[in-house]
From Swiss-Prot:
Domain of life: Eukaryota
Record flagged with keyword ATP-binding: no
Annotated gene: APRL6
The keyword Acetylation appears for this protein: no
Protein name stated in the entry: 5'-adenylylsulfate reductase-like 6
Thioredoxin domain span: 49-165
């Protein structure tokens, strides 16, 4: 009886599906922490596994600080720190900022800081060798490195790897920057504004346009002058200019024919007569006012 019952049980065990060997052999340490863990355990596990977990490409934007905080951050620290110096008015800085945020996400072990031009004194900028915007500084202990060359994501990743010896945890890829849209809006604002506002907002552009106009004038003025001289020699050299000479003689006789002193004296006399009439009317009104005031007082 027992043998009859064991036979179907053994058959069912043999036919049951087995787990795949890949899933059984998967190491637990390569997995990202789940939310079912306690909060403090999940936070500690995430911090420990973030460098090795390539599937967790989280966005980690750079921290905004000012110049004084930057000096405190870089003084006497051995950890690697990357600093972006940028200007909000610069279109190249607007393009560089999302790339720097991507680098912060790809290299979470490196602390990324961002300093805007207006938040740092010129002494701080000159101290860290900032000559233009955008500029990147990589500080590793007592040493500092300035990436020179292309500011594309691929070249900066190579610089990070060469300087710090760290590999990116994930490759996010270059972002698409709407340069055409930003440039078109800036051009529309520039054309809609007045000339004074355009000069205040874009002084370098105004000086460059003036320089180009002067260069064009210097380049084409000799040719233009030679053309005018040739036209004058060809068409107006043999023209009868006696009419112009007679006209100048007539204009010279006008001051002698018209006595300007008499006209000026008549104008002065007419102005004096008008002033005397005004004074007489004002004195009469004042006298009438003095006579009427006691009457008003008596009536009251």
């Amino acid at each position: 009886m027992a043998a009859r019952l064991l036979a179907p049980l053994l058959l069912l065990l043999l036919l049951a599906p087995l787990p795949p060997p890949a899933a059984a052999a998967e190491p637990e340490e390569a997995r990202c922490p789940r939310e079912r863990l306690p909060p403090f355990v999940a936070a500690a596990a995430a911090a420990a596994l973030r460098p090795s977990c390539r599937a967790s490409a989280e966005r980690c934007p750079a921290e905004e600080i000012n110049g004084e905080e930057l000096v405190k951050e870089l003084s006497g620290k051995e950890e690697c720190t990357a600093v972006l110096f940028y200007a909000s008015w610069c279109p190249f800085s607007q393009r560089m900022r999302p790339v720097f945020d991507d680098l912060s996400s790809m290299f979470p072990r490196i602390k990324h800081l961002a300093v805007e031009q207006t938040n740092a004194m010129p002494a701080v900028l000159s101290r860290y060798g900032v000559r233009s915007f955008p500029s990147i500084l990589i500080a590793c202990g007592p040493y500092a490195y300035w990436p020179v060359g292309s500011k594309e994501l691929d070249s900066l990743v190579n610089v990070y790897t060469a300087v710090t010896g760290q590999e990116p945890i994930a490759y996010l890829g270059p972002r698409k920057w709407s340069a055409a849209r930003t440039g078109s809006t800036q051009h529309v604002k520039l054309w809609k504004s007045s000339i004074i506002e355009a000069l205040k907002s874009e002084p370098y552009l105004a000086f460059s346009i003036l320089f180009i106009c002067l260069k064009i004038l210097v380049a084409f003025f000799p040719k233009f002058f030679s053309c005018i001289k040739g036209i004058w020699v060809q068409y107006f050299r043999h023209a009868n200019l006696g009419i112009l000479a007679k006209l100048t003689q007539l204009l010279e006789c006008v001051p002698h024919a018209v006595d300007l002193r008499k006209i000026w004296s008549k104008c002065r006399l007419m102005g004096g007569a008008m002033n005397s009439r005004v004074w007489a009317s004002s004195l009469a009104s004042m006298s009438f006012g003095e006579r009427s005031s006691p009457r008003a007082a008596v009536l009251d």
